[in-house]
A protein has these predicted regions:
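N-terminal, membrane-interfacial amphipathic/helix-forming hydrophobic leader that caps
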Residues: 1-116, 125-126, 278-289
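Hydrophobic alpha-helical transmembrane segments of integral membrane proteins
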Residues: 51-61, 133-145, 209-242
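Hydrophobic alpha-helical transmembrane segments
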Residues: 57, 89-90, 128-133, 173-177, ...
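Juxtamembrane helix-loop-helix connectors linking adjacent transmembrane helices
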Residues: 72-94, 105-183, 201-215, 287-289
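Membrane-interface helix/loop boundary segments of multi-pass membrane proteins
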Residues: 125, 186-227, 255-262
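Functionally important transmembrane alpha-helices
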Residues: 222-289
Length: 289
C-alpha cells in the first residue's frame, strides 16, 4: 500500500467515524425528546394549501415538460460534433430554473402565496440549524445503506458517470450547481410542498381536522409524507437501488416540512446531502487516478 492510499484510508475512516458518531448522537437526542413527550421538530402552525389535485398535475407537467423541452431545444441548435453531455447538463440547469419560476408563477396566479408555497425565510436561522441536525442524522446510515445496496444493484447515474470520466473544473462546477442548488430547490418545491402539502390538506379534510397544520397526533400526517416520499424515490428509479435510501431520505425531509410548512431547511439538507455525495465521488476519482 502506498503512502497516498494509507492517507486516504485513514481519512475515510476518520470521516466515517465522525459521521457515525454524529448520527448516533442525533438518534439519542431524538429518543430523549420522545421520552419527554417533546416534538422531534418544533411545530410551527401553518395554513392548509389552497391548490387542487389538478394543480399538482399541472406542476409536474411544467417541471417534466420544460426540462425535456429544454434539452431537446438545445440539441436542435448544436451540431453532432459537440459532446452532448455538457450541453444537456447546461440545458437541464437552465430549463429547471425556468420550470421553477413558471411553477411558482402558476400557483401565485391560482391564489397561493409565497408563504403557502413554503418560500419563507422568516425563521431561516432556526431552519438552518434543523438542516445541520438533519444532515448529522442521515448522512451515515443512508450512505451506508446505499453502499450495501450498490453491491447488489450497482448504482448508475449518467451525470455521475460523466463526472468520473471528466476531470474538468467547468463540468464539476456545473454538476455542483445542479446537484447542490438547482435540483434541491425544484424537487423540494414539487414533492415536499406542492404534492405533500396537497396530500396533507386532503388528509386533514378527510379526518375532520379543522385547525391549522400540522395535525397534532404523531399518527396523523405520515400517510401524506410516505406517499410523497415514495414518489420522490421512484422519480430516481433506474439509478440502481438508489430509490430506496432516497425514499427514506424523503421521509426525513417530508417530516421537517410537515412540521413547519417551510422549505428552507429541506432545501439546505437536500443540497448538503447531495454535496457530500459529490465530494465522495470526487475523492474516489482522485484515488482511482
Amino acid at each position: 500500500m502506498s503512502a497516498t492510499e494509507g492517507t486516504f484510508d485513514f481519512g475515510t475512516l476518520l470521516v466515517g467515524t465522525v459521521a457515525v458518531s454524529l448520527s448516533v448522537s442525533m438518534v439519542l437526542l431524538i429518543l430523549k425528546r420522545l421520552l419527554r413527550g417533546q416534538n422531534v421538530v418544533a411545530a410551527d402552525s401553518h395554513s392548509p394549501v389552497s391548490w387542487t389535485g389538478t394543480d399538482v398535475c399541472v406542476a409536474f407537467m411544467i417541471m417534466i415538460g420544460m426540462q425535456l423541452g429544454g434539452v431537446i431545444l438545445i440539441r436542435s441548435f448544436v451540431g453532432p460534433s459537440i459532446e452532448t453531455r455538457p450541453v444537456d447538463l447546461a440545458a437541464s440547469i437552465c430549463s429547471t430554473v425556468c420550470a421553477v419560476v413558471c411553477t411558482i408563477g402558476f400557483f401565485l396566479k391560482r391564489g397561493a402565496t409565497l408563504s403557502m408555497l413554503g418560500l419563507s425565510l422568516l425563521h431561516w436561522r432556526q431552519d438552518a440549524w434543523r438542516a445541520i441536525a438533519g444532515l448529522a442524522l442521515v448522512v451515515a446510515p443512508l450512505l451506508t445503506l446505499a453502499g450495501v445496496l450498490d453491491s447488489f444493484v450497482p448504482y448508475h447515474h449518467p451525470i455521475i458517470d460523466f463526472l468520473k470520466a471528466h476531470q474538468d473544473a467547468t463540468v464539476t462546477a456545473m454538476i455542483v450547481l445542479s446537484a447542490v442548488v438547482v435540483v434541491p430547490i425544484a424537487e423540494e418545491l414539487l414533492f415536499r410542498r406542492i404534492l405533500q402539502g396537497w396530500l396533507e390538506t386532503r388528509e386533514a379534510q378527510r379526518s375532520g381536522w379543522e385547525g391549522p397544520l400540522p395535525m397534532t397526533s404523531y399518527s396523523k400526517g405520515w400517510g401524506s409524507i410516505a406517499v410523497a416520499s415514495l414518489c420522490f424515490g421512484l422519480a430516481h428509479y433506474g439509478q440502481g437501488a438508489a430509490w430506496i435510501p432516497l425514499t427514506l431520505f424523503g421521509m426525513v425531509l417530508g417530516w421537517s416540512v410537515s412540521q413547519t410548512g417551510r422549505l428552507f431547511s429541506a432545501i439546505l439538507l437536500h443540497g448538503a446531502f447531495n454535496c457530500v455525495s459529490v465530494v465522495i465521488c470526487l475523492l474516489q476519482n482522485n484515488q482511482a487516478s
